[in-house]
Design a protein with these regions (language model features):
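Structural recognition of alpha->loop->beta junctions
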Residues: 103-119, 160-177
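Substrate-recognition element of Asp-dependent hydrolases with the DxDx(T/V) motif
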Residues: 63-67, 72-104
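Metal-dependent phosphoesterase signature
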Residues: 31, 38-77
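Acidic, Mg2+-coordinating phosphoryl-transfer loop and its flanking beta/alpha structural elements
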Residues: 131-168
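A structural signal for isolated positions on well-ordered beta-strands in alpha/beta enzyme cores
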Residues: 85-87, 129, 146
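Active-site neighborhood of HAD-like aspartate-dependent phosphohydrolases
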Residues: 1-52
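Conserved Lys-Pro-Asp/Glu-containing loop-to-beta segment of HAD-superfamily phosphomonoesterases
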Residues: 114-142
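Short catalytic/ligand-binding loop motif for oxyanion handling, primarily in non-cytosolic enzymes
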Residues: 13-16, 21, 86-88, 95-99, ...
């Protein structure tokens, strides 16, 4: 049984895509999600635009119709059924925590409410496996690392140096977890 920490934004749910969508509707613009090539929004957009995008992360309208990534519900449910301990961690503003709790209960009712954790330094959670889109979080943990591929986390050197498994969709996660378990059993003898 593994203790698995899963990041909420842009790993379980495409939150940044939704933020861009809401921004474009409000301003009749055509910002492109693919423009986000750095985790820090200020490195991707003008200051005023980045400020507004960051504020959208705490607006309820972003979360009202947010859906999990394809395959996430089935995969997370399967991990729990296999006996793994699953937690969802988010480095979020307290103003949107309630909406994140509602989304988890709606789409992932099999994850206990107490397993949603608001924390900035996820490495403190002492996980066996961390599934995350932010490379800095993956680099700071001793857990097995699974990087949920996004435009802002492409770094082949980090993948190699930090032994990061990279996934492009939730359908690959079970196989990666199984490989991690096999490697752990072989290592322990």
């Amino acid at each position: 049984m593994l203790k698995i920490i899963i990041d909420f934004d842009d790993t379980l749910f495409p939150t940044s895509e939704k933020v861009i969508e809401v921004y474009n509707k409000r301003h009749n613009t055509k910002l492109d999600f693919a423009q986000i090539t750095n985790y820090n929004l200020y490195d991707n957009f003008e200051v005023e635009t980045a400020d507004e995008l960051i504020e959208l992360f705490v607006e309820k309208c972003v979360y009202d119709s947010l859906q999990p990534y394809k395959g996430a519900v089935r995969t997370v449910k399967s991990l729990i059924e296999q006996g793994h301990e699953v937690y969802v961690a988010t480095a979020t503003d307290v103003r949107n925590m309630e909406w994140k709790e509602e989304l988890l209960q709606k789409h992932f009712p099999f994850i206990p409410k107490k397993n949603l954790i608001r924390i900035h330094n996820k490495a403190l959670l002492n996980a066996d496996v961390m599934i995350e889109d932010k490379l800095d979080n993956l680099k700071s943990t001793f857990a097995e690392r699974i990087c949920f591929n996004q435009h802002w986390n492409i770094d082949d050197d980090a993948d190699y140096v930090y032994s990061i498994f990279r996934t492009h969709h939730w359908g690959e996660i079970n196989n990666i977890i199984n490989e991690i378990e096999r490697n752990n059993r072989q290592w322990k003898g």
